[in-house]
Amino acid sequence: MFRSLAKLRCFASSLGLSSHKNIKSVPLIRNIHYIPDNPSYFTQNARFNEIYLHLENILKFAPKIIAAEEDVPKKWKTLEQYQKEFSDPKTTKVGYRKITRLLNELNEIVPEYRTEAVQKALEKFIRPDIVVKTTLKSQMLDENGMSITKGKRKSSKATVKMLPGTGKFYVNGSPFDVYFQRMVHRKHAVYPLAACNRLTNYNVWATVHGGGPTGQSGAVHAAISKSLILQEPSLKQVIKDTHCVLNDKRKVERKKTGQPKARKKYTWVKR
């Protein structure tokens, strides 16, 4: 055993490998190690970072043509569906909210100008059940040319039926100038018709409940704006330019602790 070991000749540490004669006969051994394909491999959640960076890159080179708000429904998969389909169980609600924020920006692009990459990215995250519902809920005019739309403002909700006519306007069965006693509420309710110069072109029947006159007139205002777009799609830009409200999400600001109201403060008294 010791004789066989004595016959082995080791390389001197002071000499390079090229100085030995039999170097070509010695097999070159390299350290074999795995090189990951994904640059995010060494991060805490590689799958999430890969998807997020991919969407961010698509958004960077996507055309910046924004559609109207009513054409941008939110219809993304739930967190549980995302974790199962994308094999990403580590992502939390906060992380998935970052992904949906990018998807909302991509979804705001006008469909006619979306690139193939944008369309494919959106299709991967769209909930199939929501797609069916939006198809069934597509608003159309009936056989008489009447549109039925709904509007909200504060705690008030309104349903408006509108069809071509002579300018009649009823709210809960009463003429609108009788139902809304203050001029400011009357003007706000009919503002979309006045802005589009259609005061005498349509008959309007509105049903409204909840809230006070300010909220009810705002709900009727929003519903009429939607009805005008259904009746005449060419008025969409006019309604947008004249600042007609389609969806007003403002709410009453909550009262703060230590204050009499939301913003009002108690008088400071020196003690």
From Swiss-Prot:
Membrane-crossing segments per the record: none
Subcellular localization, as worded in the UniProt entry: Mitochondrion
Range annotated as the organelle transit peptide: 1-11
Segments of this protein annotated with the region Disordered: 251-271
GO CC term, one of those recorded: mitochondrial small ribosomal subunit
InterPro entries: Ribosomal_Su5_D2-typ_SF, Ribosomal_uS9, Ribosomal_uS9_bac/plastid, Ribosomal_uS9_CS, Ribsml_uS5_D2-typ_fold_subgr
Cell membrane found in the keyword field: no
GO process terms (BP): mitochondrial translation
Pfam families: Ribosomal_S9
The entry's keywords: Mitochondrion, Ribonucleoprotein, Ribosomal protein, Transit peptide
GO MF annotations, alphabetized: RNA binding; structural constituent of ribosome
Tree of life domain: Eukaryota
Residue spans of biased composition, Basic residues class: 252-271
Function, in words: Component of the mitochondrial ribosome (mitoribosome), a dedicated translation machinery responsible for the synthesis of mitochondrial genome-encoded proteins, including at least some of the essential transmembrane subunits of the mitochondrial respiratory chain. The mitoribosomes are attached to the mitochondrial inner membrane and translation products are cotranslationally integrated into the membrane.
Subunit structure, as described in the record: Component of the mitochondrial small ribosomal subunit (mt-SSU). Mature yeast 74S mitochondrial ribosomes consist of a small (37S) and a large (54S) subunit. The 37S small subunit contains a 15S ribosomal RNA (15S mt-rRNA) and at least 32 different proteins. The 54S large subunit contains a 21S rRNA (21S mt-rRNA) and at least 45 different proteins.
Recorded family membership: Belongs to the universal ribosomal protein uS9 family.
Protein name as annotated: Small ribosomal subunit protein uS9m
Organism: Schizosaccharomyces pombe (strain 972 / ATCC 24843)
Gene name per UniProt: mrps9
